Structure formats: C-alpha cells, structure tokens
Amino acid sequence: MTIKTGTRRKSRELALQMLFQMDMGKQSADHVEKTFWAERKDLEEEVRSFAIDLFHVAEKRSEEIDKLIEKHAEHWRMERMAAVDRNILRGACAEFMGFPKTPKPVVINESLEIARRFSSPESVQFINGVLDSVARELDAERKKKS
C-alpha cells in the first residue's frame, strides 16, 4: 500500500505534536496518546496509523535517539534546543530507525518542511545539518553490517 505524501506529512505533524506534548507536559506516552486521539476522531485511518507508529518508535527508542541527536548537534545539548526543533529531530530519527524503507532524503525534506511551518528559518538550517549527519552515520553503520 502506498501512502500519499500529504498523508505522510500530516502523520508526521501529528507525531510531532504528540512528542511535543509528551516532552513539554512531562506526561506518559500512554496518557498523551489517549488524550491526543480523543480530540481527533475524524482523521483517516492511514494518517492516524502512521502517526501512532512513528510516535511509538520515537518513544521506545528515545534514549538512543537523543544520544544520536546530541552526538550530531555540535555544541548543543537536548535541553538547550527549542522544543519544536528537538521533537522534529526525534521524529525524523525515529523514522530513520523504524521505517528504513523510506528514503532518508525524503525524511529530511519532510522534516525541513515541517520546521518551516512550526519553527524559525535558523532552525531549518540546524535541523538539516543534524539530520544529514545522522543519516550519513546510519548509512555507514548499515553498510558495515551488510
């Protein structure tokens, strides 16, 4: 089944909103998911499904993802980053790890479009640099294993 680009972007934005809510509200993933979807019953199933899957990967692999982001965000600790930027990066890294069939340039481009919508112009450049570096490392690791 092929999912349209607009559908995927909507899912990514929803996953970002859940990650942001969990991060800023210091709430459990279960609580965030339950309350978030209680208010959004009218969304298409494919939008909802991919958003939930992406959120679950980001939540389950959060420590690994945060370490990876900090490694590639030179001179930036996670807590110093803007919350929106931090969670855009988390969502993209979760997609790199949990959905390896999605081309990394697509994930990066989608993340930049989301950053243009929800963050600042400076953040777009920052996110691009971090994700490009993360993608190169993950590709190098994958090549070593094969």
Curated annotation (Swiss-Prot):
Q: Which keywords, in A-to-Z order, does the entry hold?
A: RNA-binding, Transcription, Transcription antitermination, Transcription regulation
* Ribosomal protein in keyword set: no
User: Which GO terms fall under biological process for this protein?
Assistant: DNA-templated transcription termination; transcription antitermination
List, in alphabetical order, the Gene Ontology terms for molecular function in this entry: RNA binding
Q: Which GO terms describe its cellular component?
A: cytosol
The lineage's top-level taxon is Bacteria
Q: Which family does it belong to?
A: Belongs to the NusB family.
Q: What does this protein do?
A: Involved in transcription antitermination. Required for transcription of ribosomal RNA (rRNA) genes. Binds specifically to the boxA antiterminator sequence of the ribosomal RNA (rrn) operons.
Q: What is this protein called?
A: Transcription antitermination protein NusB
Species the sequence originates in: Koribacter versatilis (strain Ellin345)
Q: Lineage of the native species?
A: Bacteria, Pseudomonadati, Acidobacteriota, Terriglobia, Terriglobales
